[in-house]
Amino acid sequence: MIYGIGTDLVEIARMEAWCRRWGEKAGRRLLTAAEQAEFAAHAEPARFLAKRFAAKEAFAKALGTGVVAPALLTAIGVGHDELGKPVLILSDELAAFAAARGIARMHLSISDERGHALAFVVLES
């Protein structure tokens, strides 16, 4: 059964401004440690940040809490499975919070085109 659905659209120019403002610290405020390493090596850091930010916001909306503890941006990670499909990776605290609410499966889709990044999350119980 569907627990929640969330979507988010991010303007890549917004993340470009974020990167200019925060410089090397830009990723630390939004990303997990694993994502920060990927961000530092990415050819298009603002696009990378926009896609990750959209995914995290979409997850928080699907969860129904918004971005508040324990669903903080740095507790919600995005990785890829062996085929390259995007997957959500939660901190231990957030994973326990989700499990306590009966969430058994998480689905994530991310897309970007020119000036925007979009993410869609479905949580199942």
UniProtKB/Swiss-Prot annotation:
EC number: 2.7.8.7
Gene Ontology terms describing biological process: fatty acid biosynthetic process
Main location per the UniProt record: cytoplasm
Keyword line: Cytoplasm, Fatty acid biosynthesis, Fatty acid metabolism, Lipid biosynthesis, Lipid metabolism, Magnesium, Metal-binding, Transferase
Reported function: Transfers the 4'-phosphopantetheine moiety from coenzyme A to a Ser of acyl-carrier-protein.
Single Gene Ontology MF annotation: holo-[acyl-carrier-protein] synthase activity
Gene: acpS
Protein name as annotated: Holo-[acyl-carrier-protein] synthase
